[in-house]
Amino acid sequence: MFCVIYRSSKQDQTYLFVERREDFYRVPADLMAHFGKPLFSMILPLDGSKKLASADTGKVKELFKEQGFYLQVPPPVESLLAQHQRAEKNLIIDPCILASE
């Protein structure tokens, strides 16, 4: 079994996996409209000989059987506030600097 991977023309880091090239008949029309024009990326075997970058091969196979495609979306972006708060917690203040003030 192979998967054909397309990247989205509208959504950054979003990929659509289908079983055959140009075979989008099982992908819902709303999803295709949101995805934009599929831009061919590559064809990979799903036999375990090659590892998928961000997807589990077993999950891709399972969803091919259930719905005929697999959609890979980017991980959620951490808010800038959360990044700032985490950085503040990890901030180490040199006591020598405080003593000189």
UniProtKB/Swiss-Prot annotation:
HAMAP family: UPF0745. It comes from the Bacteria. Pfam families: YcgL (PF05166). This is YcgL domain-containing protein SG1337. Residues 1-85 form the YcgL domain.
